UniProtKB/Swiss-Prot annotation:
UniProt keyword annotation of Cell cycle present: no
Protein name: Putative protein Brevis radix-like 3
Family to which this protein belongs: Belongs to the BRX family.
One CC-aspect GO term: nucleus
Gene transcribed to yield this protein: BRXL3
UniProt keywords, alphabetically: Nucleus
Positions of region (Disordered): 7-27
Pfam families on file: BRX (PF08381), BRX_N (PF13713)
Domain BRX: 158-213
């Protein structure tokens, strides 16, 4: 191509101003100039492309396997820590357990003072004084047995006391549904010892229940 350019220049010199002045000569010069520009552009573009390939040949491509993004639905939470309270205890969200059912109040022999002990078959002495100054023996609780009575309290029960015999005082509870129940039996310490109080209750239990309950 450069030889052609030299030949054209030589021929142009021999022809003199005649060839340059003709329209055909001007077109040839324009065509030659355009070809030179195209060659320069192609050559510079080729060099840039080769330089880019050489620069990126040693680096991994963003399209390669090592640069593939993970699946959007995958979340790696291994780097996250559990949120903790100031004291260091981790927050835990659990369903609260339902509260235990409320059992109906039971007024039975287990609540009577004149009962038998679970750990000691004897009688306890829990001395107390009545308003009149008489000292009474308060017995201990007995194991709940067949005489248990379950009462559903729909109103506040009313208590009242009866002197069934000299030295024997019984506190009753009026049940909301009607009738009475025993709450406490007290024996005068001056008249009853522990053994005698126990014998008295065993002999008079049925009579007291039939009369007052």
């Amino acid at each position: 191509m450069l030889a052609c350019i030299a030949c054209s220049s030589k021929e142009g010199g021999e022809d003199g101003s005649r060839g340059a002045a003709t329209p055909h000569g001007r077109d040839a010069v324009k065509s030659l100039t355009s070809q030179l520009k195209d060659m320069v552009l192609k050559f510079s573009g080729s060099n840039k492309h080769q330089h880019y390939k050489a620069a990126t040949a040693g680096s991994p491509s963003f399209r390669s396997r090592s640069y593939r993004r993970p699946y959007p639905g995958f979340i790696d939470d291994s780097a996250f820590m559990t949120t903790t309270r100031p004291g260091g205890e981790a927050y835990m969200y659990t369903r609260a357990a339902p509260p235990p059912p409320v059992r109906a109040a039971s007024t039975s022999m287990a609540t009577w003072d004149m009962t038998r002990s679970k750990s000691n078959r004897g009688w306890q002495q829990d001395a107390g004084r009545s308003p009149g100054g008489t000292t009474w023996i308060q017995s201990i609780e007995e194991e709940a047995g067949a005489d248990d009575v379950t009462v559903v309290e729909d109103a506040v029960p009313r208590e009242w006391t009866a002197q069934v015999e000299p030295g024997v005082q019984i506190t009753f509870v009026t049940l909301p549904g009607g009738g009475n129940d025993l709450k406490r039996i007290r024996f005068s310490r001056e008249r009853f010892g522990e053994d005698r109080a126990k014998v008295w209750w065993e002999h008079n239990r049925d009579r007291i229940q039939a009369q007052y309950l």
